[in-house]
Amino acid sequence: MSLSPRSDRTEIRRSWGLDSIVSALSQASTDPLPHHLLSDQFYPLPSRESLGLILHGLRSVLFPRHFGDPELSVETTHYFIGNTLDKTLNLLNEQIRRELWLQHVTQGTPEATPAVLSQHASELTQAFAQALPEIKRLLDSDVNAAYLGDPAAQSISEILFCYPGITAITFHRLAHRLYQLGLPLLARITAEVSHSETGIDIHPGAAIGGSFFIDHGTGVVIGETCVIGDRVRIYQAVTLGAKSFPRDETGALIKGQARHPVIEDDVVIYAGATLLGRITVGRGSTIGGNVWLTRSVPAGSFISQAQIRSDNFESGGGI
């Protein structure tokens, strides 16, 4: 029996009954959601694979000695950063252009010609690049917080290479800037790349201050409208989630409302704690392990399981 490729593709297709299957799949691939069908033309969507490459390129620019060329020297660092950043921003510009085109198709903005979209993509790419020095400053404070806050940490290199919380906050700070620039899909893909790598789920909309430290990290969830101050430390399996979801007169969820906790400066939240709703945890407070909290607490509070009373729970907890 010959194993060589067969040239008669029609015969192969018929042997598996593929004609009807391919036709059905081709029709289904246009997308069943009505608001996605504003154009009869196919358009390139953002690529998760490409964005993963972009993120790791950006990380090598932010921490070149650890994630850049292993042969990097003091003399070649400047060139490496410039060259890598140029290549990475070109890739990002294309992904931004694709999201803008998707927004145009789904929202029907009439003025969005290809030339206009390309110009807008370039402007957003430039704005993102301008934010990188501030992102680097914040990340340096995060790394320092991890080193000072974990007695097991032996070096900065160990933290950068081995701490999932640092990987998560690195990608989050990049995702948050994309979110601020009106690129929610790229931001969300970035967050999911981070989630897949670290087990830490931070929505790109969450606003997080400097010197932030997630220790261990597995199972941490931080919701879209969370506001977290400076020098906050949280441990594994902490949830900063929503308590309930308001609906409009048609029964549809009302999106975009503030529904997640506000964590003020210098707060520590220990493993397994669940904080739900638009509550405020006052500055310098400590939330003990496995606490279930649905009410605000003043500055300087120490909340343990023994102090928590039974609170009414509404649907959607922890999301």
From Swiss-Prot:
Induction: Transcriptionally induced in the absence of sulfur, requires CysR for transcription. Part of the srpG-srpH-srpI operon. InterPro entries: Hexapep, LbH_SAT, Ser_AcTrfase_N_sf, Serine_acetyltransferase, Trimer_LpxA-like_sf. The keyword Transcription does not apply. Gene3D superfamilies: Hexapeptide repeat proteins, serine acetyltransferase, domain 1. The keyword NADP does not apply. One of its GO terms (biological process) is cysteine biosynthetic process. GO terms for cellular component: carboxysome; cytoplasm. GO terms for molecular function: serine O-acetyltransferase activity; structural constituent of carboxysome shell. Keywords: Acyltransferase, Amino-acid biosynthesis, Cysteine biosynthesis, Cytoplasm, Plasmid, Repeat, Transferase. It catalyses: L-serine + acetyl-CoA = O-acetyl-L-serine + CoA. Its EC number is 2.3.1.30. Pathway: Amino-acid biosynthesis; L-cysteine biosynthesis; L-cysteine from L-serine: step 1/2. It holds the Pfam family Hexapep. It is found in: Cytoplasm. NCBIfam families: EPS_EpsC. PANTHER family: SERINE ACETYLTRANSFERASE. Belongs to the transferase hexapeptide repeat family. This is Serine acetyltransferase, plasmid. The gene is srpH.
